[in-house]
Each structure stands twice: as C-alpha cells, then as structure tokens.
Amino acid sequence: MEVQKEAQRIMTLSVWKMYHSRMQRGGLRLHRSLQLSLVMRSARELYLSAKVEALEPEVSLPAALPSDPRLHPPREAESTAETATPDGEHPFPEPMDTQEAPTAEETSACCAPRPAKVSRKRRSSSLSDGGDAGLVPSKKARLEEKEEEEGASSEVADRLQPPPAQAEGAFPNLARVLQRRFSGLLNCSPAAPPTAPPACEAKPACRPADSMLNVLVRAVVAF
C-alpha cells in the first residue's frame, strides 16, 4: 500500500510539473531529469525503510532470551577460585621471618664486583717511555705495514730504473771522451820550441805533421 501511494504521489507531481513547464524552453527535458531523480530518491527511501523494519524484530529477540552463561566468564572464574582455596588460608605472601634465607654462595655471587670493562681510549705516546710503547697494537701494526709497503715500492722503482750504461745507449758517450781529451791537451804545458838545425844540415822543407788537436776535430766532424 505504501508503494502504491508513493507511485501515485510521484505521478500527480510529474503531471502537474509537465503542465506548468509546457510553455518553457527545454522544460520537458528538465522535467524528465528531475522526475528521474525524484523516482530514484523515493525508491531509495522505501528500500531503506523496509530494511530497517525487517531488522527491528531480529534485534528485539536476543533481548528477550535468557542470558547465556558463556557471556559472563569472570564471575564463574571468581567462584571457582573461592571454592578452591580453604576458608582459613589467604593468598597473601609469607612474612619475612618464615622465608628461607639466601645461601652464602648466592650472596657472594650477587655482591661480587663486575669485571671492569676494557678501556677503548687510546693512550698518548707522551706518557710512555718508548716511542712505540704508547701506541695501540692496531696502530703499530698499521705503521709497520705502511713501512713495508713503502720499502717494496722503492725496491720495484730501483729495479725498473735502467743502469747508467744502458741509458747512454749502445755506443759510449763521444762528447764525454772528446771533452776529456781536449781538457788533457789544454792543461798540459806547451813544449819547448825545437832548436833550428845548422845551415849545413838543413834539409828540404816539408809539410809539418798535424797536431793531435786537428786530428780530433776532424774525427768529430766526420762522426
């Protein structure tokens, strides 16, 4: 009955709107969209109201039923605890006089001082007698490794460096040899001029022999 009444109400409302919007431009199209939204809204309201009415009797039934004993477990637990304990006993801790005294071993173990933690602070070398005595073992080991690496690198560099004889090439340094010869000739004292032979023993004039200096100059130019 309620659905029929709602349908009749929507029909009369839509007819009244169509009659009044017949002279408006685009009134019918607007009325159709408004009519659709009105129908959907009313259908939603009817559906929700019917659903609420169906759920109300289901909610009222559990309230009328007797209470379930499983819903109150704390009370049962308290009753069982009271029955388990005798009437004259109370669950209170024993006094200090009746408790057992701890043994000597336990007291010594509790009172024993804890081992001192190893200090991780580095000691300064100024407080120690020797230079390496104040260093931490790890630092000393690192320094030794660094020195060994430097020694190995120097040995490799010495091996890779060519000897001086190989650096000059296959032939000896000619300039060095000539320099020694020239310095020897220049540093020596000039020889005494030869005495002229007598006229009777005069021989025909000939070309004088070349000096050692001229020979060396020619050799340098030819080379």
Curated annotation (Swiss-Prot):
Expressed in activated T-cells (at protein level). Expression increases in metastatic tumor cells (at protein level). Residues 63-172 are annotated as: Disordered. Residues 125-138 have a biased composition (Low complexity). Its main location: cytoplasm. Residues 69-78 have a biased composition (Basic and acidic residues). The modification N-acetylmethionine is found at M1. GO terms for biological process: cell motility; neuron differentiation; positive regulation of transcription by RNA polymerase II; response to fibroblast growth factor. Induction: By growth factors and 12-O-tetradecanoylphorbol-13-acetate (TPA). It is found in: Cytoplasm; Nucleus. DNA-binding protein that seems to act as a transcription factor. Involved in the regulation of neuronal differentiation, acts upon JNK-signaling pathway activation and plays a role in neurite outgrowth in hippocampal cells. May mediate with FIBP FGF-signaling in the establishment of laterality in the embryo. Promotes cell motility, seems to stimulate tumor metastasis. This is Immediate early response gene 2 protein. It comes from Homo sapiens (Human). The gene is IER2.
